[in-house]
Design a protein with these regions (language model features):
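Solvent-exposed loop/turn and edge beta-strand elements of beta-rich ligand-binding domains
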Residues: 1-188
Length: 188
């Protein structure tokens, strides 16, 4: 997009672009690189309009100054590193006494994989039923797991140790972390 009116070099011809006019569309390649060439000198901005599956769209525009430098600079270039955040999942557990609904501190819970977790090459990073994270319930009977989980994975939470005076439950809570779209940074 043009960040300002991009005037013709001769000052007489029609302007190349008006402020906020879309100049073009670029798409990153398999290496994450996007390029656009042959732009007239001027100030521009780049806006991300779509991102890869599992990532959060970065709505902040990046401003690019391709203004004339000097007679010894034949081509003006601009490089910007743009890194998107991965979508996160927030997993919260509430431990209560069965008959009274009283919250219980001191329960130990684990977050586990329900299936093998693989990298982009298909290599197993974590095997099925691996413990990812372990937490203890606080005075409000709550835990929030903070592990950075891969999107589209299947997981479960189960109690490892009950609070003092209680019996550990065998109950397992399964869930799937599904991608909720590029506009949502966290899913719970």
């Amino acid at each position: 997009f043009a960040a300002e009116d991009i005037k013709a070099a001769d000052g007489v011809s029609e302007d190349y672009f008006k402020t906020d006019e879309k100049v073009g569309t670029i798409t990153t390649d398999s290496n994450g690189i996007a390029q656009m060439g042959d732009l007239p000198a001027g100030k521009y901005y780049v806006k991300e309009v779509k991102t890869a599956h599992g990532y959060v769209l970065d709505k902040e525009p990046r401003y690019v100054d391709l203004s004339y430098r000097d007679q010894d600079t034949p081509v003006i270039t601009y490089d910007e590193k743009w890194q998107n955040a991965r979508q996160k999942v927030k997993v919260t557990v509430l431990k209560k006494e069965k008959d009274t609904e009283r919250v219980l501190a001191g329960g130990v819970f684990g977050l586990y994989t329900s299936e093998n977790i693989k990298n982009a090459k298909g290599e197993v990073l974590l095997e099925k039923d691996s413990l990812i994270e372990q937490r203890v319930t606080d005075e409000k009977g709550q835990i929030t797991f903070t592990a950075d989980l891969p999107v589209d994975g299947k997981y479960y939470v189960k109690e490892i140790f009950a609070p003092d005076g209680f019996i550990t439950t065998d109950e397992v809570q399964e869930f799937t972390f599904e991608y909720a779209g590029e506009d949502q940074a966290e899913v719970s």
